[in-house]
Amino acid sequence: MPAAPSFIQTLVGRFDLSVFDARRRRTRIRLAVSDDGIWDVVVADGAASVVTPDGRPDAVLTADADTWRQIAVDLSSGMDSFRSGRLSVRRNLHVGVGFLAATSGATEPGRLRFRTIATSGARLSIMEAGIGPPVLALHGLGGTKGSFLPTVAALAGRFRVIAVDLPGFGDSDKPIGASYDARFFAGAGIDLLNALALDRVHLVGNSLGGRIALEIALRHPGRVGRLALLAPSLAWRRDRPWVPLLRLTRPELGLVQLAPRPLVEAIVHRVIPGAEDGWTAAGVDEFLRAYLTPAGRAAFYAAARHIYLEEPHGEEGFWTRLRTLQPDALFVWGRRDRLVPIAFARHVADALPRARHLELDCGHVPQVERPKQTHAALAAFLSEAPDAPPSPRSREDR
């Protein structure tokens, strides 16, 4: 095997196990330099070493030599390269981006890191960066904390941003038999805050994560500062003809039902039409990584079932409860969203006259499809809170 380039040797030489969340005793990361070669890095026994490429790696990182040199100098260049498509991270964002964070050479408080938190109910995988008022980011159905990489990069200069894999998804536990409804997820969120010793946080939620953020705020208003809800999944107001059938259908059927990758790719393209191809490919990888496990499929179907079955009206109905929401809220809607039509904004405005609204030309994942506009709005909104720090220029505005 030819010697690894100096920039790869620099990265490996800086490896810091304390910020690398290895879920296995032996982790293999493949580093590909376009038109120049491939090298594997194996993390085992607390150290990282360059070895001959072999077998199936846990993550594959691909970039040209100039991009790798930039990453070796400054991790933020790696995040910029990933967002722009110059760096590809495939198979496992948790491992791939976690490796970059562990080889950045950064030592200051608030640097990007990945870790697993043992809560009272489950082990939850988180990605966090920054110092300041805490912001908890909750991903959507079938997603992972990786969908908030742009958010972490954009807001970490002013906030401590924590993105979590919800139970049932990503690298978090996937308990068989859990209800995976809004109440269950809200309880998991509070368990995480308790484990992190956080009394109060701002919440940012996308899709299912938006619904969970609302549930946390409705049940525990004293634990929530402000709410930023990105295309949140809300209870359907109109007739739902499939309700009787879905009530009879058990989510455990997901234990045996698979989905081919081409089908998943087509769905992801429709859901996030404004995303770069690299993001779409990574999103498909992240979805399939959990979905291809029986417990992950069961969690997905259970959560999807509860979104559709949630009672919209009546004393305990969602829209009745929504009127009692206390924290200030910002709703971000996508004009091309096929899952949560923008017509929901009118119903939210009726229930919450003081809530703010932003419409963007995107689909269902604004933080990925329209990162500059989304994060500018989030930074401005969250900075109005009494405990927010002064406003430096964000990286995305430079």
Which stretches of residues belong to each language-model region?
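Short beta-strand/loop motif that positions the catalytic acidic residue
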Residues: 325, 331-333
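Flexible "cap/lid" loop of the alpha/beta hydrolase fold
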Residues: 218, 225-258
